[in-house]
């Protein structure tokens, strides 16, 4: 997953309501939460949506630090620590480390009235070693409106084949400009796999990106580790079942 110079026309991020502004090296803004961003039967926002927003918030900062090289996301976490059941969250992202080889970032999700931190995310980025992976100037501000009219997993095309087995086809709505599956889509895919396997809500995700889904479809397999933990693998089924992502999901049960 890489930082975007802008949100491509027709991509799912344009259908999520948020505003982002970067100044003095800090990425600030807010996320509008609608029912489409919640799991079925829950008042809480999806952990994978928080992971996606974290990648947008700090991926832009990492991209600016790596420019003109593309910043690639190596790993991404989202941990819900409070009530995320309102209709808005304020978001603050910053870089914790900017080294020669890696960049580490943190994102806080805060209650819009009290300012209390209700979710946390951390991400590690690296500049792409491929000379062709370059980006233009990154925007210091973005705004998009709520346009989802069905649950986000359904909108992204997630198909549940059996408990823990979910697939998503590549396509313009879910792809990066490079044609690979966008990393937030992979996080949603893994979250749905863990949900369908256990019947419980995900409250924490640890996502390790190993390779891009270049052919598709992306397909999951999931196993329970203990009463609260599910391990999910995401593979590129059209590319010799290449392992693309490993996810650890913590369940609320």
Predicted features along the sequence, with ranges:
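Hot-dog-fold acyl-thioester-processing enzymes
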Residues: 12-14, 28-59, 164-196
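Alpha-helical transmembrane segments of multi-pass membrane proteins, especially transporters
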Residues: 47-48, 74, 232
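Hydrophobic beta-strand-centered segment that forms part of the acyl-chain substrate-binding groove
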Residues: 58-90, 95, 188-220, 224-225
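Short solvent-exposed loop/turn micro-motifs enriched in small/polar/acidic residues
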Residues: 11-15, 100-102, 151-153, 200, ...
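Non-catalytic linker/capping segments at the edges of enzyme domains
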Residues: 1-30, 34-36, 124-172, 253
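Intrinsic-disorder/low-complexity, polar/charged segments enriched in Ser/Thr/Lys/Arg/Asp/Glu/Gln
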Residues: 26-28, 75, 88-90, 104, ...
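HotDog/MaoC-like acyl-thioester-processing domains
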Residues: 71, 82-148, 212-215, 224-253
């Amino acid at each position: 997953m890489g930082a975007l110079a802008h949100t491509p026309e027709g991509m799912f991020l344009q259908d999520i309501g948020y505003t982002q502004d970067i100044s003095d090296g800090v990425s600030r803004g807010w996320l509008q939460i609608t029912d489409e961003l919640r799991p079925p039967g829950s008042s809480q926002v999806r952990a994978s949506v928080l992971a996606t927003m974290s990648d947008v918030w700090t991926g832009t900062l990492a991209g600016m630090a790596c420019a003109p090289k593309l910043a690639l996301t190596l790993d991404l976490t989202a941990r819900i620590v409070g009530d995320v059941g309102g209709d808005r969250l304020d978001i603050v992202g910053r870089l914790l480390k900017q080294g020669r080889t890696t960049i580490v970032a943190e994102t806080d999700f805060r209650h819009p009235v009290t300012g209390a931190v209700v979710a946390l995310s951390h991400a590690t980025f690296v500049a792409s070693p491929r000379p062709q992976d370059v980006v233009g100037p990154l925007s210091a501000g973005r705004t998009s409106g709520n346009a989802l009219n069905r649950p986000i997993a359904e909108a992204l095309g997630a198909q549940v084949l059996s408990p823990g087995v979910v697939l998503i086809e590549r396509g313009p709505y879910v792809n990066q400009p490079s044609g690979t599956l966008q990393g937030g889509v992979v996080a949603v895919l893994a979250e749905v796999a863990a949900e369908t396997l256990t019947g419980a809500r995900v409250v924490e995700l640890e996502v390790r990106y190993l390779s891009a889904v270049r052919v598709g479809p992306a397909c999951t397999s999931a196993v329970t580790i203990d009463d609260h933990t599910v391990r999910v693998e995401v593979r590129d089924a059209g590319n010799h079942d290449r392992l693309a992502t490993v996810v650890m999901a913590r369940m609320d049960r």
